[in-house]
Amino acid sequence: MNETLNEVKKILTDAGIDEASVKARIILREVGNMSVEDMLLQKEVKNKDEVLAFARKLADTGAPIQHLLGYADFMGEKFIVTPDTLIPRDETELLVNCALDKINKISQKKQDTINVLDIGTGSGCIACMIAKNAPQAEVLALDISSNALQTALENAQKLDLIKKVVYRKSDLFSALRKGETFDVVVSNPPYIRKKDYDNLDKTVRDFEPKSALLAQDEGMEFYKKIIKQAAKYVNYGGYIAFECAKGQAREVCILLERNGFQVSDVIKDLSGVDRVVAAQMVLMSDNTECFSI
């Protein structure tokens, strides 16, 4: 096994692939069907040729390993990913867990179904993991990309969540029907600034959808658009939660406080970045925008 692992690492290292050691072990696990125990015991890789061929393909294309595999791990599940969807990141688990916490709080007072809205669902990983872990919730997931919605639908079917998650093509709130409101709204919107986008790792910049990454107005474009309209769609006492990039949480908090919400949580990731902001709707909605931004 060590021989194969070293060969894979050399192929990746020679091609300038970042984190070659980590990716080599992923290849042995996912392509070579090697468990952690197998690796510790240095068991023989039975399909060495297939493993090396995958490593060479990764080296030649420079593509994200998840695209070549066709899936990404997220919260213990494998989600189909394509060039039309963002690859789920570990940090996004914080957003899911925050939403689950708010659902549980609301459930203590509300016996009915908890209605959840996921704006910009992409692969559907957030919507699916909320639906899987909150049996009292029903999720409406929106995305402007038809291709992303198709992938999200396939993920819901694969996880047997098709009855709990509804998908709808929508530019932010545009496809919502009159009177539709929600107890919890979540979004991991595009938030990369133009100057930062140009400096992204090429596996992100060249292979993941630009429309799901890049935001104008110093990365604040979609936070402003969503928060400006959110008061019409979040029930009184309900919550809205966002994932944020480094340095954005403070401005997101200010926008929320100016538009009928009271910030309840600012959650740091393992790097100490303020990654998730959550806020509670504290104004009774009259179906109008609260304040201009």
Where are these regions (language model features)?
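Conserved AdoMet
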Residues: 29-102
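A short N-terminal interaction module
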Residues: 1-47, 51
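C-terminal lobe and adjacent flexible extensions of AdoMet/dcAdoMet transferase-like proteins
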Residues: 277-284, 293
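Mobile active-site "lid"/loop adjacent to the S-adenosyl-L-methionine
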Residues: 191-222
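Conserved Class I SAM-dependent methyltransferase catalytic core
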Residues: 217-280
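Short helix-capping segments at alpha-helix termini
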Residues: 16-17, 134-136, 157-162, 233, ...
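Conserved SAM/SAH cofactor-binding pocket of Class I
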Residues: 94-199
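Residue-level signal for inorganic ion chemistry
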Residues: 27, 62, 92, 126, ...
